[in-house]
């Protein structure tokens, strides 16, 4: 395994270090619950710190919000109107997979990120038996570690493997559940079925340990956040009853009432189940989500102003004129002073002149859970419940909304092929509500659909992806290559294709029969 052993440090100091240091060792720190909390909070800082996972391109590498933005830009609903300073442009153009030899690009970045969290979580979990303190504190710390490991396995698999549905027994990513160190022997890729079974086992253990304990900080897991993650994982797996039941618990932890003044910069908002409050000492300027979204930052000369993030015209025009969410976008002239587009106003700094505060990170909101309830009820044949759940959400956003006339679960081959079904309507409202938050391409994968970008949607000609196969659910276009650091260190890894499909299945792909064998 390419990652080295970790030494834990306080969340008040630098992030967890992947190299041996002379600071307090992980084994020593985990002897008490005080040290356990320090280790947990140090790991959590990885959810918003930047510059820790690569040797370059730091300003597009800052944890889950950067990877969700990457995955949103890989879809069809978010338009990036210009290259700007270059950040996220190559994700948008699907021009990152061939850079797997570099430690400054996406393959290394995302792989290093998720396996660093997994390694940290393994150390914390392994420290349970030797940890002194109250049972309640120990269970809270270990429960959180299991939840973070579940999160990391699920999202890493979404990035480095094809969809779970339809590829359950194809190769995914390796599983490590014990502490690792420099020189730990690498493991072969497990299947999607095995990886998601591990993620589901972890999140169930987290839920059991957390019980009804109160969330000590909004960046931690409690029963609501853990069930929200369980709902996400189960939804991606197509386990709709499990997703439904977990979302029904999670939604009780927040509100899905619409707040027109909420611009996704305040983790204490009633809709937020999980987020991170950023204090002055932890704030930054350019390498954060809102800097890439808010056109007001740096008087329009920042990343958000140079590379505008817009809704596709197709998606915007699906909203009714009285839908309050239309205010999240404005049809205006873009940075070239010629082109017009649906510029986003959903994500804004509280004060664009002070990016060190009023720039919290949001990881999960209650409206997502309500939409999962609606979708899963529909898929399970409970249309009356599905309609009631969607109407309850939408009445806070659009006066007079009523989906009672819709029925069925048919979806088009492409995301723009309309069937008029109830399920399609639920998915549409999910696309609108969670725009910029959830990683659109993950949904495209699980729904087994394809998409085509067009200039009419607002996409630049350079981003139309005409040479790719994004209309095919079997494509590897949505699957990252493994970094060379891992492939070179772990001879059991079968590389993913750099193109849409394998050119030599003996050397690349996800066929278990082609995987390198243990010597």
Regions found by a protein language model. Give the residues of each.
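Membrane-proximal, proline-rich intrinsically disordered regions
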Residues: 11-69, 294-297, 315-320, 401, ...
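Short, surface-exposed recognition loops and adjoining beta-strand edges that mediate ligand/DNA contacts
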Residues: 21-30, 54-75, 160-169, 173, ...
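Extended ligand-binding clefts on enzyme/binding-domain cores
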Residues: 33, 38, 47-58, 194, ...
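Conserved, well-structured interaction surfaces
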Residues: 84-160, 190, 207-213, 356-361, ...
